[in-house]
Amino acid sequence: MAAAVRCLRRVLIHHQRHCLCKMASQASLYPCSVNSLLHNRHFAAAAAAATKPARKIKKGAKEKTSDEKPVDDIEKIKSYTYMESDPEDDVYLKRLYPRRIYEVEKAIHLLKKFQVLDFTNPKQGVYLDLTLDMALGKKKTVEPFASVIALPHLFSSEVNKVAVFTANASEIKIAEENGAAFAGGTDLVKKIMDDEVVVDFYVAVPEIMGELNPLRKKLKKRFPKATRNSIGRDIPKMLELFKTAHEIMVDEERQNFLSTKIATLDMPSDQIAANLQAVINEVCKHRPLNLGPFVVRAFLRSSTSEGLLLKTDSLLPKEAKTTEAETEETQTAEAA
C-alpha cells in the first residue's frame, strides 16, 4: 500500500514540472514588456478612449438636423402631371388622367354596359354612395339621421312589416284591415320588449306616445317620430307609406357617409335617375340650403362594378332667391 502511494506521488510531481516548463517556454516567445502588460490591456484601451479628443460637430450641420422635418408619406409618392387629352383606350394608367366625372344618364349607361361585358347578373342592385358635409357652423354638426321615403319606382316586390301602436279598439281594427302586421297598445309594447314581435317599421297615434317610452332605447332610430311621418291619426295613410317605404340612414361609424340601394340594373334608365333624385332631395332636407352644398361627393355603382363619380350641380336643390318685391311684401306683412 505504501509503495503504491509513493508511486502516485512521483507521477503527480512529474506532471507538475512538465506543465510549468511548458508555460515558461510559451511566455518566452513574447518580450517582457508585452508579457507584463498583456493582462492589463483593457485598462489601457479605456484610458486611450478617455484621453482621445471628442469629435467636433459643425454648427451648421447641427442646425441643419434640428431644422429638418419628417417627410410625409404622401410627399414620397412621385407626382405625375395629367395628360392634356382624354385616354384613347379603355385601358390606361389612372395616375396620368384626372378622375372622370359623369352625368347621371352617362353613368347609368356605363353600368349597364359593364354588366354586359362582365356577364354579371342583369338584375343586380344599383347603389348610391354619398359623402356629406355635416358642419352647421360654430362647432355644431348635423346629427346622423334616418329617413323614410316613397321612391317613385319600386324595385322590390316585398312588403314591409309595420306595427301600429294604438289602444283604441276601432283603430286596431282599421290597422289590421289596411295590412298592419301587428296592432295594439301596452300588450304590443311588452311583446316587442320580449323580442316576440320584430317588424320593419313602427307607427303610432299621438295619444299613446307616453306609454312607448320603454321602447325608446330598443327601437333607437325606428322609434315613432313626427319628423319621419310615423306619428299621426290617419292610420291607412301611414300604412300605405311604410308598407312600400325605402329607408336611408347615415352610417353611425363614419358619421358623414350614406349608402343606399336605389334600383336594380334591369330597370329603365329614367326610373333609376328618378329614384336617385328622390333620395338626394330627401337627404338635402336635413341641412339648411344657405350653408352650401350638403352632398360633397356622389358615386353611383352596381353590385359588381366600380363607383362612378357623378356631377352633382344639377342634382342638388337650389336655395330659392327672393325678389325685392317679395321681400317688401314680407316686411309689410310682418309690420302689420
Curated annotation (Swiss-Prot):
Matching Pfam families, A to Z?
Answer: Ribosomal_L1 (PF00687)
User: Does the keyword Ribosomal protein belong to this entry?
Assistant: yes
Q: Which UniProt keywords apply?
A: Mitochondrion, Phosphoprotein, Ribonucleoprotein, Ribosomal protein, Transit peptide
| Transit peptide, residues from-to | 1-50
On this chain, the residues bearing Phosphoserine are 85
Tell me the compartments it is located in: Mitochondrion
Q: Which domain of life is it from?
A: Eukaryota
- Name the predominant localization: mitochondrion
Q: Name one GO cellular component term.
A: mitochondrion
Q: Which GO terms describe its molecular function?
A: RNA binding; structural constituent of ribosome
Please give the InterPro entries that the UniProt record associates with this protein. Answer: Ribosomal_uL1-like, Ribosomal_uL1/biogenesis, Ribosomal_uL1_3-a/b-sand, Ribosomal_uL1_mit
Does the UniProt entry include the keyword Oxidoreductase?
no
Gene Ontology process terms (BP): mitochondrial translation; translation
- Hey, which family's this protein in? Belongs to the universal ribosomal protein uL1 family.
Q: What is this protein called?
A: Large ribosomal subunit protein uL1m
Q: What is the lineage of its organism?
A: Eukaryota, Metazoa, Chordata, Craniata, Vertebrata
Q: Which gene encodes it?
A: Mrpl1
